[in-house]
Curated annotation (Swiss-Prot):
Keyword Signal in annotation: yes
Additional notes on this entry: Antibiosis properties of legume lectins are proposed to be due to the lysis of epithelial cells of the intestine by binding to the carbohydrate moieties of these proteins.
Record: glycosylation sites: N32, N80
A Gene Ontology molecular function term of the record: D-mannose binding
Pfam family, one: Lectin_legB
Lineage, top ranks: Eukaryota, Viridiplantae, Streptophyta, Embryophyta, Tracheophyta
Function: This insecticidal carbohydrate-binding lectin is toxic for the cowpea weevil.
Family note: Belongs to the leguminous lectin family.
Protein name, per record: Leucoagglutinating phytohemagglutinin
GO biological process: defense response
Length: 272
């Protein structure tokens, strides 16, 4: 897991000068319910995997399943008193498996949501949004396995979502059934640059998407961070959505340095 090694370096640099009680770091190589807020169908397996969607009585992915899981403690993403915004980095490994008699749907996402947020619509909305024009105060990186004609590009993709399921930026994603995917997401508050990369170590393939996002204008001061996933609403399109490990670090910054961006470039260059 080359990306895991470089992400460890990223964490160490991010936290070298940490001096605030609101600087956060955690690392789950196995999950337990103690440190998580589980919603709807999400659960932790006996082997410590985070299962965001569940199975039917035949042991296959259930149609219309929706699950979300967030770190139990709120994260301060910006400071109303000083105006500073946090830089963050997160790394996780997930696995999506599709039965032989089905196609994949709908996907999973890493998300920053308001504290106390409740699940939204299932299916293509990934449990994070719905069909209204509401301000969801949500930023997400989606790993979308099914084309939804009303808002998706025509290919499976990784997308950056800001208050809407219609991504502001996407990149093609060559989904590999049943293979572990390693993800690294970084946010540099000095440049507002959000970068997400996915690597399949077994395939030696990688995918990257990035765009600028002003978190302070989108999110509340305190957020919950975690995952949301859904299966398809039709019998022929279902999948498992399991997160195997997860690390996260955030640090409030004065915005005068770009160490988050430099570190992101370093790590991404190493794992490509």
């Amino acid at each position: 897991m080359a990306s895991s090694k470089f992400f460890t370096v990223l964490f160490l640099v991010l936290l070298t000068h940490a001096n605030s009680s609101n600087d956060i770091y955690f690392n789950f190589q196995r999950f337990n319910e103690t440190n998580l807020i589980l919603q709807r169908d999400a659960s932790v397996s006996s082997s410590g995997q985070l299962r965001l969607t569940n199975l039917n009585g035949n042991g296959e992915p259930r149609v219309g399943s929706l699950g979300r899981a967030f770190y139990s403690a709120p994260i301060q993403i910006w400071d109303n008193t000083t105006g500073t915004v946090a830089s963050f980095a997160t790394s996780f490994t997930f696995n999506i498996q599709v039965p032989n008699n089905a196609g994949p749907a709908d996907g999973l996402a890493f998300a920053l949501v308001p504290v106390g947020s409740q699940p939204k619509d299932k299916g293509g909305f990934l449990g994070l949004f719905d069909g209204s024009n509401s301000n969801f105060h949500t930023v997400a990186v989606e790993f979308d396995t099914l084309y939804n004609k009303d808002w998706d590009p025509t290919e499976r993709h990784i997308g950056i979502d800001v208050n809407s399921i219609r991504s502001i930026k996407t990149t093609r994603w060559d989904f590999v059934n049943g293979e572990n995917a390693e993800v690294l997401i970084t946010y540099d508050s000095s440049t507002n640059l959000l970068v997400a990369s996915l690597v399949y170590p077994s395939q030696k393939t990688s995918f990257i998407v990035s765009d600028t996002v002003d978190l302070k204008s989108v999110l509340p001061e305190w957020v919950s961070v975690g995952f949301s996933a859904t299966t398809g609403i039709n019998k022929g399109n279902v999948e498992t959505n399991d997160v195997l490990s997860w690390s996260f670090a955030s640090k409030l910054s004065d915005g005068t340095t770009s160490e988050g961006l430099n570190l992101a470039n370093l790590v991404l260059n190493k794992i490509l």
